Amino acid sequence: MDTFKDLAARHDALMAEAPGMRIRDRARKLHVTEGELVARQLGVTARPIACRPVEIYPKLGSLGRILCLTRNEWAVHERYGQFQMVEVNPKVGLVLGTDIDLRLFFSHWTRAWEVNDNGRISLQFFDREGVAIQKIFQTDDTDLAAWQKLVDEFALAPAADPGAQAAGPSSAQAAGAAVAAGAGAPSAAAVSVGAAAQAAGITPEQAAALLAVRDAPVFEPLKPAVTDHGATLDEAARLHLRNRWLAMTDPHQLWPMLQELKLSRITALANVGEDLCQQTDLLAIEKVLQYASEHELPIMVFAGNHAAVQIHGGTVKKLMRAGPWFNILDPNFNLHVNTDAAVSSWVVNRPTDDGPVTSLELYADNGDIIVQFFGLRKPGNPELKAWRALMEGLCAKPLHR
């Protein structure tokens, strides 16, 4: 593990080489997590807050219009609007409304900060490995007084000095680096806290805190990457899977069913039968979004990670390709998908009490979902005929009805 001094030096060198690089990309280059850079205040100013989303999220409606960002390694889902109905318990959260629609799984949430990244201010929540779960950004229409009240209520440290805040992230970074530089000398154990504070331009109390945590592990090590291209089941297992699949009455029954059967999602798709799950070409995402844009077909777009899923419901308009990224760039909704990372694309056909519900789903090399698309529907209603026809048009073989 890097000491603070080592990591700060490598970070400074990277910033000098690529000053405009985003924090997530810097973390990847440095072989650390984004949370590690935030916790060490490298390139950002960060104020720790209590990671108590069960208490925080019901209060987010008071902030007015915000930007809610949820992402995984390959897709970024951004939705502007105001939090409306929020239901939480210690394990899960449900956010519903015309603007913000979320499914939250709190067992993974461990750390939180208010972050100032070059003047862009957000609340950021991380898992135990330092992977970002969700970020809530201020907009021009955010109620700043309500924001400050919320942050102060849950803050674990006093606010930064106004002068330091105005100076930007470099102030906190310089202070930490100055303390670390003093503490990194051969006689580190004998370093005077007062001398370190004077060198850094901070109080002795702040210097003592920095010295105490400068090299302490903040997050657990990242789990090694895996691949999952699906296993081949024997005939009995395939038949059992198919019968269970056909017995579904609600789309949300799929995940617990796979947990019970101890099957990865990609294994289930590959074995349940082509009338229920059918692989498409990787360009299907562009075809579907182009059709939805041109015909004003309302859709649902799901993207997220192990701890949060964010949903857009409505039409999409402005589409743009930028290198490997295919983008939706609408006033209240942005989606960025790295299509080069997709190794498979599937039409997934779920039986329900309201008739079949179909989706287009992109998968990464490790078997994780990159993004999902459905036709817009409410429980109790059948899926849109135009959406069903669009999904059937992607398939070489008929889908089960």
Report the location of each language-model feature.
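C-terminal functional regions that serve as terminal interaction/effector modules
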Residues: 1-33, 296-310, 314-316, 320-401
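N-terminal, charged amphipathic alpha-helical interaction modules
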Residues: 16-41, 231-280
